[in-house]
Amino acid sequence: MDGMSDFDAVLFDFSGTLFRLEEDESWFRGMELDTEDKGEVDAHVQAELMRRLTQPTGRSVSMTPQALDAWMKRDLEPHLHREAYLHVLRESGLARHHAEALYSHAIDPACWTPYPDTPTVLDGLRRRGIKTAVVSNIAFDLRPAFAGVGTVDEFVLSFEVGAVKPDPAIFQTALDRLGVTAARTLMVGDSDEADGGARTLGCAFALVDPLPTRERRDGLIAALWAHGIPL
């Protein structure tokens, strides 16, 4: 272990923190909006659709009571996750078959891009003897995304544990699995509202910006450095 740290463990959010869902032009090829004028799904529309697929909190379209119920529970049940996001994409103007095609990319671990410093951070923490966990509000198994990227000690996924950030229960599950205390744990995420919930238990918290991967080369390294964990 290289030096001492005030932390025994670091918890990471997934989307917008370790990885980002970044569109490929092929995903939108042949798509048009399901409106009277059949508008083009241009770069601006693509960016907004991706934002709506990945925003950690809040909602971006009008919802019926049934759709709202699915939205509120989306990270607990895969079928509700599908229902909620297909509703968002349909309300955003996509035909159903286009909405289903785009949604299929969102839940495919192979479609998620790691931030440039994710491998360095995961490897560096392991070498220092600092335990790691991914704590994510999600309704699909993201573990395959880490193949060839890095090793994580524990995955605490909302749909598997029945709790959603910022509920302290999901963070406590991570602490228990790692065998660490909140006082010696850092949570890193892109949502002050959701990820910052770890502070309720006494964890430290580092906020990162969910920028495109090409624009955030060392955000994780900087966040750890600011909390006394140089890599």
What are these regions (language model features)?
Residues 1-12, 20-22, 94-97, 119, ...:
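Asp-based, Mg2+/Mn2+-dependent phosphohydrolase catalytic module
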Residues 3-116, 128:
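N-terminal helical cap/lid subdomain that shapes the substrate entry/recognition surface
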